[in-house]
């Protein structure tokens, strides 16, 4: 069997019930991260909203960390993620990087006239998103996402959205699970 340790800033994290030990500290507490890493044979991340600096500290401890800091950094920024995917030949919906509300109108024309404004960071399950169907909606959409750096993604026809989870072993073997369908209200 495995002895599972978790590291999180909350003392009452749900995973604590199944863990042998819960390390409670801020994600940027380098000393606590090093102590945690020294107690582990391998470390994995539950989600992508952990500071990259935390993964850098763990990686420096020479404990296998999956995903590593580079993958974590890419997954935290929608523009970086799309550029990476396009760069390795995986197509995405057309998009434009948005730094200010004044960028939206020209970007809207380039993506076909209708799009979804999405924060570059910290967005999930519809959080940090606003539709832009006409140039007059740009300011409202920008305000709705908190005036955060964003991408404007073209509205494209699709049948459904799925999430694909793939695991890869250290020797390169991959395994995937049946993809669940995502339904957003």
Give the predicted meaning of each segment.
Residues 74-163, 167-185:
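Active-site nucleotide/adenylate-binding loops and adjacent lid/helix of ATP-dependent enzymes
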Residues 1-83, 102:
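ATP-binding N-terminal substructure of ATP-dependent carboxylate-amine bond-forming enzymes
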